[in-house]
């Protein structure tokens, strides 16, 4: 395996064969490819546009090298995670939605880290509300089983990423590493709501997840660039369910919700993001609550806790109105600090 030769082929717009991509990723993740060459390779792949096979191979390697979390019954296990890198600087929509989905009976294996390209990452806001991020795999497995939700702080589970992390940080642009995070859930969640930073990635990642054995997933991209289901206009969806992929688009009006500008959801600090998350869990009406209804409804649906997305949205509404979603957040704060004491 010759990284220079692979780079030359990438620059000529050639796809890297699956087995060769596996070998290349193992070399990168073991520190056997220099930072300069790693940066050139991932930038070249980005310009060429990563193929289904290349992404699948890279994700397979990251999954192999990840610290695993074993959950006894994973049938309703779901992750709500985005690629980030959308530049929209919204509050943590998928993180807030995770509490709502957990309140509805989904088992949420939330996977995330600190912000790389946005204002506030999921780990930043969860830490701000009092959740202890430093938990062992066994403790997180218990959290998922007993509380219904657990948070996996990505750096604690993807130790091999330490070789690529400085490159990713210094480049400061979207690369295959943005795509890989949501594809490498340490608990192996086979149900997923996955937001992506580019519309072209919806169908691509649906095919990747199909190859990787996912059960029910929705890959979403808002027309405003948001890596979530958006309120400002249409959202492009690629839905993988029972081995088949269907592509379509939805609008807020399809669920009886009003459109709202992206600016109404943007934050400038962790404090702003925390305040908006808590406002939604307190069931305060407005665009923040509405966008969580849309996204949590989808998560509830893919987790198998509603037989349609529309019913998932109504269940999400009930979870916020009853206070069950806020109670789920409080339960996770309490559990994470008990087990870490």
Curated annotation (Swiss-Prot):
Catalytic activity: N-(5-phospho-beta-D-ribosyl)anthranilate + diphosphate = 5-phospho-alpha-D-ribose 1-diphosphate + anthranilate
Pathway note: Amino-acid biosynthesis; L-tryptophan biosynthesis; L-tryptophan from chorismate: step 2/5
Cofactor dependency: Mg(2+)
Binding residues annotated for anthranilate 2, in chain numbering: 168
Entry keyword annotation includes Transcription regulation: no
Pfam families given in the database record: Glycos_trans_3N, Glycos_transf_3
Enzyme class name: transferase
Cofactor detail note: Binds 2 magnesium ions per monomer.
Database matches in InterPro entries: Anthranilate_Pribosyl_Tfrase, Glycosyl_Trfase_fam3, Glycosyl_Trfase_fam3_N_dom, Glycosyl_Trfase_fam3_N_dom_sf, Nuc_phospho_transferase
Entry keyword set: Amino-acid biosynthesis, Aromatic amino acid biosynthesis, Glycosyltransferase, Magnesium, Metal-binding, Transferase, Tryptophan biosynthesis
Gene Ontology process terms (BP): L-tryptophan biosynthetic process
GO MF terms held by the record: anthranilate phosphoribosyltransferase activity; magnesium ion binding
Annotated binding of Mg(2+) 2, by residue: 227-228
Keyword Transferase tagged: yes
UniProt: Mg(2+) 1 binding residues: 94, 228
Binding-site list for anthranilate 1: 82
Residues involved in 5-phospho-alpha-D-ribose 1-diphosphate binding: 82, 85-86, 90, 92-95, 110-118, 122
EC id: 2.4.2.18
Entry's Gene Ontology cellular component terms: cytosol
Family to which this protein belongs: Belongs to the anthranilate phosphoribosyltransferase family.
Subunit structure: Homodimer.
Protein task: Catalyzes the transfer of the phosphoribosyl group of 5-phosphorylribose-1-pyrophosphate (PRPP) to anthranilate to yield N-(5'-phosphoribosyl)-anthranilate (PRA).
Protein name according to UniProt: Anthranilate phosphoribosyltransferase
């Amino acid at each position: 395996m010759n990284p220079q030769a692979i780079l030359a082929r990438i620059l000529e717009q050639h796809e890297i064969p699956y087995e060769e991509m596996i070998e290349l990723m193992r070399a990168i993740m073991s520190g056997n490819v220099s930072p300069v060459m790693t940066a050139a390779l991932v930038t070249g792949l980005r310009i060429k546009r990563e193929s289904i096979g290349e992404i699948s191979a890279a994700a397979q390697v990251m999954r192999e090298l990840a610290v695993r979390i074993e959950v006894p019954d994973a049938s309703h296990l779901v992750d709500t995670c985005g690629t980030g890198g959308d530049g929209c600087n919204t509050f943590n929509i998928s993180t807030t939605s995770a509490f709502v989905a957990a309140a509805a009976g989904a088992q949420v294996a939330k996977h995330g880290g600190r912000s790389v390209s946005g204002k506030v990452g999921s780990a930043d806001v969860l830490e701000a509300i009092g959740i202890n991020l430093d938990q062992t795999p066994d403790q997180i497995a218990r959290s998922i089983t007993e509380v219904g939700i657990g948070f996996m702080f990505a750096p604690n589970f993807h130790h091999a990423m330490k070789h690529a992390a400085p490159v990713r940080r210094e480049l400061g642009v979207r690369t295959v590493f943005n795509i890989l995070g949501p594809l490498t859930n340490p608990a192996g969640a086979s149900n997923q709501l996955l937001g992506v930073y580019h519309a072209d990635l919806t169908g691509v990642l649906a095919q990747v997840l199909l190859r990787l054995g996912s059960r029910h997933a929705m890959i979403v991209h808002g027309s405003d660039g948001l890596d979530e289901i958006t309120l400002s206009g249409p959202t492009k969806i690629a839905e993988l369910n029972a081995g088949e992929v269907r592509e379509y688009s939805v609008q807020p009006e399809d669920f009886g919700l009003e459109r709202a500008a992206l600016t109404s959801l943007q934050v400038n600090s962790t404090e702003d993001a925390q305040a908006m998350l808590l406002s939604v869990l307190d069931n305060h009406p407005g665009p923040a609550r509405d966008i969580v209804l849309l996204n949590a409804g989808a998560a509830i649906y893919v987790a198998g806790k509603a037989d349609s997305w529309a019913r998932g949205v109504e269940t999400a509404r009930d979870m916020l109105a009853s206070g069950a979603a806020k109670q789920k957040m409080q339960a996770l704060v309490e559990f994470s600090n008990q087990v870490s004491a």
